[in-house]
Amino acid sequence: MTNCTFRAAVPGDEALILDFIHQLAIYERMDDQVVATPELLTEWIFEKQKAEVVFAEVDGQPVGFTLFFHNFSTFLGRAGIYLEDLFVLPEHRGKGYGKALLNNLARIAVERGCGRLEWSCLDWNKPSIDFYTKRMQAIPMDEWTVYRLTGDTLLAAANDI
């Protein structure tokens, strides 16, 4: 791996973040679902500070990114970090940057006293699953199912009090 450095996103990086989000969405076959805008990223990442972004850079050029936020484990009684997005540009894959990004995020979790680092992976994404289980030695949480409310169902639930 060539001189990989990490840089936290700052205001002005919104277009770069959005570009990574779009490229990840294309890889995940979900590009039609991206509605994020630079303005929304400014609001939620930089103004409200609800998520953080770290870029992996080589010679000052971004090659990958992570977007993450804190969650909380009632069982552990402490915060954890939830990795929402991890993406390495196709031309830079297989060079250790994904592992470096995850290791960097693990370091952040340990420094902040977090009890765990977790994320989700699409069940068809065998290259990522193999990477997580073999290279990172992550444990799949097969007994859990993710549930989600969005759009009209979220509004209906909010109004059904």
Model-predicted regions and their roles:
Residues 53-55, 61-70:
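Conserved beta-strand in the GNAT
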Residues 18-43:
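Conserved GNAT-fold acetyl-CoA-binding loop/helix
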Residues 5-19:
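A short beta-loop-alpha structural element at the N-terminal edge
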Residues 43-55, 82:
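A short helix-loop-beta-strand connector motif used in the catalytic cores of GNAT acetyltransferases and
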Residues 119-128, 148-150:
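Conserved beta-strand-loop-alpha-helix junction that forms the acyl-donor binding cleft
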Residues 99, 123-143:
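Conserved active-site alpha-helix within GNAT-family acetyltransferase domains
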